[in-house]
Amino acid sequence: MIGQAIKLIEKGLVPDNLVRAGIRKLCQQRLEEESAYDCEKQSMQFHDFWQELKQSHIAIKTKEANEQHYELPTDFFYYALGKRFKYSSAYFDETTKNLDEAEEIMLEMYCQRGQFIDGQSILELGCGWGSLTLYLAEKFPNSQITAISNSNSQREHITAIAKERGLNNLEIITKDINEFEPGKTFDRIVSIEMFEHIRNYQQLFDKISSWLNDEGKLFVHIFCHRYLMYPYTEDGDDNWMGRFFFSGGQMPAADTFLLFQQNLSLDQRWLVNGQHYEKTSNAWLENMDKNKKHIMPIFEKTYGKDFASVWFQRWRIFFMACAELFGYAKGNEWMVSHYLFSKK
């Protein structure tokens, strides 16, 4: 039944309001599958997955995840994202008028919560299209920023923008996080929505601790569930997200990182209501629909003419799925979390 419905949706034959209703039903189904309403079963599932994470590589299926998102032509993200190319949740306060403003608010929030100041050495893990790297380079001209991405197209994009803006205080490295070793230490390490692709947090946190100066700090932004932690799998019709957009990924719990403090100590955690991500995702969808005539030729070149329309619908579904997930229960079920750690 779900498989047949998805085929109709991917052909654009189902109205958005029905698609969104179906997504909300799947959100409820996910809560039930993860034993959200049975504390004993949920506790055991959490424990079992925690043990699995400790035996895993730092990250898995990095090639697939890279292909699903980050090696798409930059032009698509130019038409879908905001001015800063921020491919993660923005923040909409009571005065925010549009996505561009919401991006700026969240980027400035990182600077405040991460305690960034001019003159620091900074490492960004998983820099995406450079929204934060470029923001930091502009705001802190005496800082030196090193950023790593698993995507060569992202490196090329960031390097080109930096050249346009006359920024020479940043270095972009294309590297799989499993293999990365910086060879030096930093005052700040930051990561925005990359740790959802990580499996072995303890191993990565141990590495990060060794990459920090004695007074250094780690700032992390992730999306998460309030208390559930589970992997995205690819089997079955209802695991559409894992199959097409999130291979090897997982949904951390807001408390997951509290279990991995052997070499890093948590200073503070902030929860950000999921409705900010809901609004961000809906803005991406609106941009995508508005720019369909520009996006379709990109998809024809990327996916082939026979599959361009299907992939246009898949990206629409992806943005709707994100919006409905994070908007569920008024943003109090799935959300964003920020963390500030100090080196022990």
Enumerate the predicted regions with their spans:
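Substrate-binding/catalytic lobe of Class I Rossmann-like enzymes that use SAM or dcSAM, i.e.
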Residues: 224, 231-336, 342-344
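Conserved class I S-adenosyl-L-methionine
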Residues: 118-128
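Conserved Class I S-adenosyl-L-methionine-dependent methyltransferase catalytic core
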Residues: 30-113, 117
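A short acidic, Gly/Pro-enriched loop at the edge of an enzyme's catalytic core
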Residues: 178-189
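A short glycine-rich, Lys/Arg-flanked "PGG" loop and its adjoining helix->strand segment in the class I
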Residues: 202-217
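Conserved SAM-binding strand-loop segment of SAM-dependent methyltransferases
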Residues: 164-177
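Conserved SAM-binding loop of SAM-dependent methyltransferases across substrates and taxa
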Residues: 129-141
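Conserved SAM-binding motif I beta-strand of class I
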Residues: 144-149
